[in-house]
Amino acid sequence: GYTIRIYSNSNSTERTTWLVNAAKDAGFTVSIDDNSVISGDTAAIQAANENKDGDILFGLNETRWSQVVNGTYENLSLVDWTPTWAEQVGQYAYPGAAYGLVIQNVLMLYRTDELGTNGEALHFQHWSDIVNCGYKWYRQNKVGGTTNANINSALLYSFVDPTSPAGGISIDGWKTLWNYCANGVYSSDDTYKYGFDPLNKGDVAVSTFYSSSLYGKIDAAAESSENPLKGTMTPENWNLVEIDDGTYYIAEYIGILNKEGRTDEETEAVKAFAEWFGSAETQAAWGEEFDSYPCNTAAADILYPDGVPAIYTLKNFALSKVDGDTTYAEYVAAHSAEWTNILTNLGFYWADSSA
């Protein structure tokens, strides 16, 4: 049979092993590099563009997919297709091109006990209100990384100004982000790479984290703290900060690449694989295995028969229109290089190298 060549950044050794075996059981032969060979979305997309041998591209985020769909990469174009489950992924689609697999978002959490707000409920209009909350907050310890970038995007959302020469964000926005970094609790310690541990230890009252690992982390919270967070699905001493704007989600998608010399019959096999991988059953199994949340609502129903977890009911402002017809995710994509320059040049994380 035909070997289906896959490029992805969702390619930990566990994921690639699972995918090769599950695909084999479903009658497909696939080839995919794990993250010892290709690490990150930039590397995955560059390899696919340079090697020109890919059949399937999956993972990435809206930033990258809008580029692929719009023909940014010389050798990457997508086959026109519509899977039978297209309706089940709703708004997570580039119709006829790419369809949603997995969503995750960033969360703002706080302690409600005496190490936190002592029972006071936190309710913000914007993410950026954290700088005026009156409590100690965590801030991440580097510019790079998907989660860190998403947190910055969430904090900058309320300061969109298409007329601003500073990356389309008002000067107040950059001042607020500076304040967030300068006055947030920081450590170069490895446990401070993300915001769960500082909150779990009680070093801060308010923190940020990514959705896909939250429930698992709370389940195991007592292993790494004397003052652990308690109550996974029914919080006892913690909660989500209620934020009117919502939060910033990223979604992973799957698309079928055009490939020179591939026969019609082989293309049909590739389509059949994409159909299988994005289906409710497969995505529910993938979500179960890797603690991820499916775009496919039928898969979510299989995974969560008791209803959608609270962290995935939050409004998604990445898909809100901010400048004419442009979504905030597209706006972030258009300005991301400028934002990285601003963050770096202004030394937002200035103390880190010497900390």
Residue ranges and their predicted role:
Residues 68-79, 90-96, 217-242, 308:
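Ligand-binding "clamshell"
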Residues 154, 161-239:
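Ligand-binding pocket segment of bilobal, Venus flytrap-like solute-binding proteins
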Residues 252-326:
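Mature extracytoplasmic/periplasmic domains
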Residues 52-57, 74-112, 138-139, 244-246:
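A structural signal for short loop-to-beta-strand junctions that line the ligand-binding cleft
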Residues 1-66:
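Early extracytoplasmic/lumenal segment of secretory-pathway proteins
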Residues 315-355:
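Conserved C-terminal helix/tail region of periplasmic/extracytoplasmic solute-binding proteins
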